[in-house]
Amino acid sequence: MRISIILLSLLFLSLHSLIKADITKLSVCGSARAVPTATQNPKPTCVNVNSQGIPTAGLNSAAFDNGVRCGQCYELTGPLGKTVVMVADVCDAGSACTQSDLFNFIIPNEEFDKIGNRSDYGNIFSLCYQIVSCGYSGNVQGVFTGPSSSPNTFTYFLSVVFSNNNVAIKKVLIKGLSWPLYESLTGQNGNWKWNKNSYELQFPATLYITSNTGETITYKMNSRPITNQPIDLDFQFNPKAISSLENNECSMALLPQYIYQDGLSYGWVDSQSFNYAKFTDKSSDTKSGSGTCINAQLDGHGGVKFTREGDFQTSYLDKLSFDIKTSADSSSFAVYFGDVATKNIDPLVASTWTTVELSVKSLTNNTVEGSITFFNNQADPINIWLDNIKWTYTDDAPLDQPTMDLIEVNNKPSTTSGTGTTSSKPSSSSGGVSGGGIGSESSIYGLSSENQENQSGHHASSNTNILLPTTFVFFISITILSLLF
């Protein structure tokens, strides 16, 4: 009976570690792009990713930022729904990967199909992303190594790879026996390394670990850690829910204000325009006399059609305005979403430049659309010029959506019972993430009782719990229990 109870306990613990906790929203909604991929790198750039069922994603080089987002989870919102992915790799080939204007997520086909329609398009240009916790219920794991010549010693060199962390880690400090100061570890792609700067590393030693949300943990190593095996570090980052974000449900990203102004805005194409004798989006015959506009010689029932891959949301669009002139006055000109013209616009379009403003609601829009068309709704041909095509937003539109900003929230949750006590924070005069990412040189941090902060921190000691794979323990437990009962 005692053996059965022990095995049942083991089974419960295995199941518990498999269950994901609820995710916590950690940022405002940002504007990004997503593309699908059929294959993923079997050896991703991030060395610390242990996704445990969370789909992995790549990021463009600028957003990846030397690996500062390795292991960070993001909730992505497209026209068909949401999915959560974890950053594991970087892409550096092609314009989408080398641009530095916005986040570009490369996600598995099956995840893209949850949020978009891969059979219709290969990009989502109005993707919304939000930083979230990864929802791990177990503890952070660490794999320690020493120098390659002597991997079990740490006197001059120490490397540690953290995994299973709820949020990405932005800074790691270490303080050895008799050291007066903390020294920083250099982070790259999820691997944190310390090289001897002024003191040899002797134990006990303490690691001071800070997440991207500002939560801090001190981990004391009473003796040399076991190398090359995952160790349960007996702590987990638990970012506190932020009241202003709790009800912040992200929809698709807000459209750029202009569809066309001296050129098409990012994500818009006019290649599906139809029934025309001549078409250019670089005409110099503009209203202002400078820049460019669109000029199309439309046949009867021809149209200038602007499409956006991955669709777009109309909820925050109030009005559509544009400058137009035609070769002849016409009362048979329509503007419409989708594929069917509903009614002609008012006022009459004329042979002189006119600014037209239309209510988006009057265009009989759906919540999500994929195109908007300027249509010659008659049998006779007409020559048209279009310029300055833009949206006016509703009052509640999220106008401040970040694109490439570091938008992690400086989250400082209170220490909860059972997780340790508040620790003093080393002076953070340099190092960590600051605009350009993590510095390549070690920095020295003073530890002064006069400069203590009320930064949240928790203590954990190195009991050196070596981890067996969760699934292995789980199936062994099931097998033994089936034999016993």
From Swiss-Prot:
The name on file for this protein is: Expansin-like protein 8
- Which residue ranges does the record assign to the Expansin-like EG45 domain? 26-139
Extracellular-side segments: 22-464
**Gene Ontology CC entries for this record:** membrane
Topological relation to the membrane, as annotated: Single-pass type I membrane protein
User: So which domain of life are we looking at?
Assistant: Eukaryota
Task: Give the transmembrane region(s).
Answer: 465-485
The species this protein belongs to is Dictyostelium discoideum (Social amoeba)
